[in-house]
Amino acid sequence: IIFSVNENKVIKKFNFYKKKYKKFSKKLNIIIENNVVYISDNIGYLYAYDVEKEKIIWAKNLKVPFRSNFKIFKNKLIAANQNNELFFFDKINGNTINSIPTEETVIKNKFENNLSIDENNLFFLNTYGSLYSINNNSMKINWFLNLNQTTDLNPSNLFLSNQIVNNNEKIIISSNNYLYILDVKNGSLIFKKNISTQIKPIIIEEDKLLFISKTNLLILMNLDNGEFIYSIDINQKIADYLNLRKKNAYLKDMMILNNNLFIFLNNSFIIKFNLNGKIEKVKKLPSKINTYPILVNNRILYIDFKNKISYID
């Protein structure tokens, strides 16, 4: 489905899949560049769709489900499959340029392979808990390290993490046990905090990290020395603002827009904080949020539980 934000309507629809996949629950990983939509899925297909010409440019069946986000570097599409194998594809024709096998995990959890990129390197965190730095041009491994605290891989202690964050100098890994700050050049540990986070952290002003702990503390941390600038109880802040009894808020996502922090709750409310940690506004969304929100032309878009697109200006 191609949705026009300006026209506020669906302008194009396209179905790649044959009837035999009609009842199969599909999970699509999507990235867009120059009116071409690149898609990988949990069946094993990888394909490119030209939005203007309304046609498939190419399609490949790798036969192993993809299980990562997408990245683009120059002529390369980069993705990983459920076996933790990293692939570099030619975005012109979909052919495989290179692949790098990494450690597999037989038991799967909700964590998916994660990719982050800067101008020189790709960072690949797999479900085993290993972090790889790979040169974007040569596709060779610079270094790798394992962040998993155990080799006993059972359902109770599988590695979990939020998405990788980097700022060209530091890599931030927020796992189920620790918050790691690593050196981009060699992967050495700068420092780590005994804090588990529930949402992807955000880097602000290049040297500060904003994140939410699993106990709903909103924390702003100095990335250079690891000191906390503030630590705020979100539950208490909401209770004080609304003059209600303190309850546990269930959080879905957060984003920065116009120098304000927006925190999305599972119960369809959105909390607007300034970057000093003060609540500016509490607003009910027009419908209950189903997908993770995205930002398009200063509008926040999401899909609700009726599969309708909603937006907030």
Locate predicted features.
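Short loop/turn segments that connect beta-strands within beta-propeller blades
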Residues: 5-8, 50-54, 90-94, 135-139, ...
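Residue-level marker for isolated small/hydroxyl-bearing positions within beta-strands
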Residues: 40, 80, 124-125, 173-174, ...
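Extracytoplasmic beta-rich repeat domains
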Residues: 9-34, 55-74, 96-119, 140-168, ...
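WD40 beta-propeller blade core
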Residues: 1, 47, 87, 132, ...
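Blade-level signature of beta-propeller repeat domains, shared across WD40, Kelch, NHL, RCC1
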Residues: 287-313
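Beta-propeller domains
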Residues: 127, 172-190, 197-198, 206
